[in-house]
Curated annotation (Swiss-Prot):
The lineage of its organism: Archaea, Thermoproteota, Thermoprotei, Desulfurococcales, Desulfurococcaceae. Its EC number is 3.1.26.5. Pfam families: RNase_P_Rpp14. This is Ribonuclease P protein component 2. GO terms for cellular component: cytoplasm; ribonuclease P complex. Gene3D superfamilies: Ribonuclease P, Pop5 subunit. It catalyses: Endonucleolytic cleavage of RNA, removing 5'-extranucleotides from tRNA precursor. It comes from Aeropyrum pernix (strain ATCC 700893 / DSM 11879 / JCM 9820 / NBRC 100138 / K1). Signal peptide: none annotated. It comes from the Archaea.
Amino acid sequence: MRLRRLAGRRPRRRYVAFEVLSLDGPPPGKGEFEEALRGVYLKAFGAESLALARPRIVYYEEESGRGVVAVVRDYRYHILAALGLVRMAGGRRVLVVPLRTSGTVKGALRAFRSPGAPGRGGV
């Protein structure tokens, strides 16, 4: 006999591709940026929302400042707002630009390709 989960379905996740533009030198490291994002999210939406959203950085290029953050689907607009509110990370002034929201990491990573790159439809 197969056991059923009583709690319901596993929450779906969305992946938001973003780019960090640093005004003071190189972009911050992954840990510095994740700490700044969590702090802004906590201040804007509270501890309960932060716990339910479970934001985490699944991909981050420290040289370019590009990355992907995973979040529970119901909180995707919260993470977009929090990304826009991040102004300091690792002691540097930064501006975070959300590029694309996707249902898969692979789809989010496509946002980093150049517009004429293969697989993007030449758009």
